[in-house]
Amino acid sequence: MFMGEYSHTMDAKGRVFIPARFREELGEKFIVTKGLDHCLFVFPQKEWKVIEEKIKALPFTNQDARAFVRLFFAGAAECEQDKQGRVLLPNHLREYAKLDKEVVIVGVGTRVEIWSQELWNNYCNGAQAAYEEIAEKMVDFLL
């Protein structure tokens, strides 16, 4: 299970360190795709297969489903760690997530998210203000 928040600096080539705690669980190769809220989602191969099957089950006759499937899969890339635990993020994904130099890597249960420091701070400031309200709404899903 992925959890925690780690700040790193992306180098000029677009490489970012994967926290040591995440490296083994992600495996040598993993999938990076466009996430929600302008972050990147990072899935281990095993989890990607689960997500892939669920997404493939969406009805292709539904316009929103087709759009989601296209964007989700078109933005995906198989990436791998180098010997130093870095990953080279494809340019189109760096642009989507507005990644510059300072990045935040967040463990979110079954996936990892990569955020620009600025977008992460903005997101946290907004979500933190509504945390209790959001928690109350989520209780319904757990029961």
UniProtKB/Swiss-Prot annotation:
Pfam families: MraZ. It is found in: Cytoplasm, Nucleoid. One of its GO terms (cellular component) is cytoplasm. InterPro entries: MraZ, MraZ_C, MraZ_dom, MraZ_N, MraZ_sf, SpoVT-AbrB_dom, SpoVT-AbrB_sf. CDD domains: MraZ_C (cd16321), MraZ_N (cd16320). Keywords: Cytoplasm, DNA-binding, Repeat, Transcription, Transcription regulation. Residues 5-47, 76-119 form the SpoVT-AbrB domain. One of its GO terms (biological process) is negative regulation of DNA-templated transcription initiation. One of its GO terms (molecular function) is DNA-binding transcription factor activity. Its main location: cytoplasm. It comes from the Bacteria. HAMAP family: MraZ. Forms oligomers. NCBIfam families: division/cell wall cluster transcriptional repressor MraZ. Belongs to the MraZ family. This is Transcriptional regulator MraZ.
